[in-house]
Amino acid sequence: KNVGVPEGLNIGIDNAKGEFIVFLNNDLVVKEKWLTEFFVAHKKFGDALYQPKSLKMKNLNEIDGVGNMINVFGFGFSRGKGEPDIGKYDKNIEEISYASGTCMFLPKKIINEIGIFDKTLFAYHEEVDFGWRARLNGYKSYYVPGSLIHHFGSANWGWSKKKFFLLERNRW
């Protein structure tokens, strides 16, 4: 039975035994030292939500996301999406609005404090709500350019009316 992305993440949280949690979509490839870079960032910035640099799998020179932001209308978006990767976002670890659910690293104690993912969202934008709750509880989110993944994107859904519905419904 497909219980949706947030509930699947919550099941993983319930079974996780470690001090840290990493959420990974099933349609990506992690690159060398991706996890080490998260621990380096955590040591420097402390308890927070962290996301890597994400390049498209089909075009390794195209950005999939380099930090998720919230625009003036309150909608979340992936900064840099579709831009050529020319190193513009490679210089520093930067504070962002919220970490992408494609790949997110965080201490489990944050989840214990802010709660699990909202399963009513089913798919898409669940990390916006999660990141917002983290921020309201004093936790920041950071983009870590030294941590790199290649993301296929839409491996399970492609484009469909249901995907469009979920994307639009969950934006509000």
What are these regions, as identified by a protein language model?
Residues 1-16, 26:
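Glycine-rich, basic loop-to-helix element that forms the pyrophosphate-binding segment
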Residues 5, 24, 28-34, 56, ...:
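Hydrophobic/aromatic residue at the end of a short beta strand that borders the catalytic acidic motif
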Residues 63, 75-77, 83-106, 123, ...:
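A recurrent flexible, glycine/aromatic-enriched loop bordering the glycosyltransferase active site
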Residues 136-172:
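Active-site-adjacent helix/loop segment of glycosyltransferases
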Residues 5, 9, 34, 102, ...:
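Conserved donor sugar-nucleotide recognition element shared by glycan-biosynthetic enzymes
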Residues 38, 97-148:
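A short, conserved alpha-helix in the catalytic core of glycosyltransferases
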Residues 21:
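Short aromatic/hydrophobic "clamp" motif used to bind/position activated sugar donors
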Residues 28-75:
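Conserved donor NDP-sugar-binding/catalytic core segment of glycosyltransferases
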